[in-house]
């Protein structure tokens, strides 16, 4: 497999050279089942799991028998906190639990490669030199630049932590979700229509992926 190439876009609407996308990351096998499993685990891990209902033993009251056993013509009852009474306990209701699932690192990495491959194949990954020219943050300029890159609604922007100007420029854009390069994950890639990398963030992501691959050998 040969490496892919993408143009590097500048803030003034031009291009400034190209970048190589390693085939091992951006031209991998895209397994829908694997991506689904990883995304499901990621969403499950975000759940608090603090839901709780009271059983009949937890509800206050209901200590005495509501009426005598015989002679009333009604069905016998032992407590007004039985589940079929209003204000009674809940049967088989949700209790606090941990929803997190164990997902091996190699599965997460493979799913992310599959998600990035899918976005590249559909021309939905863009690389930019900088989001705004100079060192002055500008939400207006960042919005205009992103709209020139894509007309789709949801955009994931991947930046380095040091790119403070870009962070401040896109923070208030409702259609833009921003991540640091080492936080890139399958769910956010698939949830966005397009992915925009800064050159620095792309290089940092590729270098980290290569380092992880070497350590795994």
From Swiss-Prot:
What single Pfam family name could you report for this chain, choosing any that match? Ribosomal_L4
Which GO terms are recorded in the biological process aspect for this UniProt protein? translation
Annotated InterPro entries: Ribosomal_uL4, Ribosomal_uL4-like, Ribosomal_uL4_dom_sf
Task: Look up keyword Kinase and say if it applies.
Answer: no
Gene Ontology annotations for the cellular component aspect, listed alphabetically = ribonucleoprotein complex; ribosome
| Region named Disordered | 46-103
Q: Which UniProt keywords apply?
A: Ribonucleoprotein, Ribosomal protein, RNA-binding, rRNA-binding
Q: Outline what the protein does.
A: One of the primary rRNA binding proteins, this protein initially binds near the 5'-end of the 23S rRNA. It is important during the early stages of 50S assembly. It makes multiple contacts with different domains of the 23S rRNA in the assembled 50S subunit and ribosome.
Family membership? Belongs to the universal ribosomal protein uL4 family.
The family database entries (NCBIfam families) matched by this protein are listed as: rplD_bact
Q: How does it assemble?
A: Part of the 50S ribosomal subunit.
Q: What protein name does the entry list? A: Large ribosomal subunit protein uL4
In its UniProt entry, the species of origin is given as Corynebacterium jeikeium (strain K411)
